[in-house]
Amino acid sequence: KIMLSEKVFAYNIGNGELLWQHDGAGIPNISLAIADGRVFFLKDDVEDEEREQARAAVQAEIDGGNYVPEREQKLSEKERDVRRVVCLEAESGREIWNRPYDLTGCGGTKLGVAYEDGRLLFFGHYSNHDEGPFNKGNLNWRRITVLQSESGSLLWSKPLNYRRRPTIVGDTIYIEPRRCDLATGEIQKRTHPITGESVDWEFL
């Protein structure tokens, strides 16, 4: 089971003084990311009206080409995983922005957050070896969603067939056994050493 919290807080490590605290419901411990003087995390306190707004926002992104839909789009509203994405100022705890977002397919109870170069990644913390389902292409529902950290607006969201939790190195996301571009989510290619064809970059 996922570990959930009801507060995010900061202490002065020099004297133990509580600097600030932010209350919330259903904050996954694995959703916290700190970078560039900001704290990012998820909350599970979205109202019905906000769920509708999040669904409409996804449809607009689908129409705009930034969100690649998959079978999770056929789920009912109650089955969809809509969370509140929150950005705080690390020094003061002041809220900079928050927005409800449909993160269906990004991991559910295993949903984690990472930061790199002004981008927030949402993905599943999977740590199993699903070679059989992977080889059959049955892990496509494992989605990665990337938001701009400054505003929370969507950069891209795609269902990617990956086995384990992604790792970011520079401008590349390693999604076992492939890798994709951090800025676009496009699977990177290489030249096959024997055939000379352009194929997906893969490792065993």
Please identify what each model-predicted range represents.
Residues 1-204:
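Secretory-pathway ectodomains
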